[in-house]
Structure formats: structure tokens, C-alpha cells
Amino acid sequence: MELLVSWYQSIKLSWQKLTKIIQPLVFAAIVGFACNWLGVPVGWLLGPLLVGIVYACLQEKREPLPSSFIKVSKAIIGLYSASRFSPDTLILATTYAIPVILCILVTGALSIFNGYLLWKWAGVNRLTSFLGSIPGSAATLAMMSEEFGAEPITVTVLQYIRMVIVVITIPTTVTILFPNEALETIMTVQPAVNDSIVSIFFNLPVLAGCCILGIILGDLLKLPTTGFLGAFLLGLLLFWSFPGLFFVPHWLWVIALILVGLSIGWRFNFQAVRKLWKPILLEIILVILLMLSCFVIGYEFHLITQIDLVTAILGFTPGGIEAMIATANQLGGDTGMVLAIQITRQMLILLSLYLLQLTQNISKKKAEI
């Protein structure tokens, strides 16, 4: 009898936890559908993001979303990006490698200058302000901040504010600037029939396998944006080895956007934001100025390389890689090129951080000797 009671209690507890997760997911899907129907740019992402922020404000002691949800959603986006990343895109990216790296260095220098201003004007610790201002893998930067002697909470809040501003404003602005492209491509991003000859019952298990292996690969190699890059690399292997056989269904892409949007909003911390109101206010102004600068850099890149303007602008946007891929998909931009530029920047940033960490460790060892 006691065993039955304990089973009942554990099932009841599991059900309560499940309903706490299902409820916001359902609301996120409804709001995402409404935003998409109303023509809101990247509605399936922005709608759930707003739902997540509302839940975060209303529930002080909320259960965190399962990490598997976030990893799987990023893995799906990684697979989708791989399906749009052709060998031609890789050739194009290598052709314009020098302009790409130069533009990345300019945007990186502007981000570091933002960190300098935060340190000078808002009284934020110098390392904290620099790590909080660098566009890239927000989770990785927040995780590494403590190792560098920075303040992890402040870095997380600054990175979060930048990411939310970018995700909300850039898709809307680009869609307003290029309305004709948006209207033309909305009709094409949701094809009724896929050209693939592989049955969906075989296609989905293969995609699921790529997602799972991609997450494991990402964890083993400690890749940034866990799940995304691992699945992206495996997706490239799959789609390039069997061109035209496998595909990522549109509904799977929508589910991934809902989960990513909800997870971003869910991490909103009102208490931390209230305590850091001065640095955050300055960060908002600096991020807006940085985005305007990135627009100019993207335009110059477009003039030099003749790559379409939508792709150029989204490629050099400071962060929000999933939202930029979704926007490029909606507006008919080259998602592969956007991804190539964004990933190149992430890799350069992470390489710089690892080199900095290595130098710090060597200096400490020398000091001990």
C-alpha cells in the first residue's frame, strides 16, 4: 500500500512539473501563431519570447525550462541551417574571406569600445564590461566570465539585454526596410509539397539521430551554442552526401523557434535588471548605436561584394544568430552566408578568449615561480 502511495505521489509531482512546462508552451504557440498571422517579423520567435518574459515577471520562483528543450531546439535550427548551406555558399564565403574578416574586426572593435564606455561611465568592472559587450555565444561568455575574474551575473544581464534588443528590433527593422522581399518569400518558405523522395517516416528518425549525435558531439567538443554547431556539422555531412533526399519539415522549424523564443524570455530576471539599471540604460543606448554601425558596415560590405543587402546586414548583426537565420529565411536572404559570417565571428571571439585565458594562466604560473 505504501508503495502505491509513493508511486501516486511521484506521478502527481511529475504531472505538476509537466503542466507547469506545458502551459507556457501552449501559450507560446498560440501567441506565436497570432504574431505570424498578423505578419509580425519572425512571429514564431518573437511571440514566444514575449510570453517567456511575461511568465518570468509573474512567477518569481519559476521552474527552469529543461535544458534538453533548448538543446534540441538549437539542434533543429542547426540542421535547418545545414540544409540551406550549400557548397556554393562555402565557396562564396571563402572568396570574400578578407572583407568578411575586416568587417568582423571593425564590429568587434566597436563592441570593445562599448565595453570601455560601460567601464568608464557606468562604473562596471573592466573585464565584466568587455565580456558583457562582446557579441557572440552569450551562454559561453557568461560561463567563462568567472574564470576571468569578472562578475557572472552582470555579464549575463548585459548579454541578455543585448540579445533581446537585437532579436526584437533587427527583424522588424529589416522587414520594414525590405517589405517587398518579405511578401514574396513568405509564400515560398512554407512549401506544400517537398521535393524529397524519402518518406517522412524515414526522414524524421534520421533527423532525430543527427540532433542527438549533434548534441553529444557539441558537449564532447565543448562547442559554443550547445547542440547547434554539432547538429550543423552532422547536417552538412548528411545533406551534402545525399543531396535532395532529406529535408527539415517546416513545422519542425516552427517548433524550434517557439522553444528558442520561450527560453530566451524565460531567463529574464527582473530583480537583476532593477539592480543594474544604470549600466543597462547605457547598454541599451550603446547597443542601438552598435546596430546602426553594423547596418552601415553591412551596406559597405554589400557595395564591395555585391552580396544582397539583406544577407549583408543580417550577417554583421551583433548576435541573435537563430533570429537572424529565421529573418534571412523569411526575407529570402542567403541563410548559409549569414550563418557563415556569424559563425566566423563567434569562432574568432572564442579563439581570442581562449588565448587570453591561456596568457592569464601562464602569467599566474610565472608569478607563483
Range-by-range predicted roles:
Residues V72-F85, V106-T107, F130-M143, R162-T169, ...:
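Small-residue-rich segments of transmembrane alpha-helices in multi-pass membrane proteins
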Residues G136-L141, T156-F178, S293, I321-E322, ...:
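Membrane-embedded alpha-helical segments of transport systems
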Residues L118-I161, L309-Q342:
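Alpha-helical membrane segments and immediately flanking helix-loop junctions
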Residues P87-T95, L177-V198, F242-V248, R274, ...:
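Membrane-interface helix termini and inter-helical loops of multi-pass transporters
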Residues E2-S68, I76-T89, L110, N194-A272, ...:
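Structural signature of multi-pass alpha-helical membrane transport proteins
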Residues K61-E63, S83-Y96, I112-N125, Y299-I304:
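Transmembrane alpha-helix boundary signature
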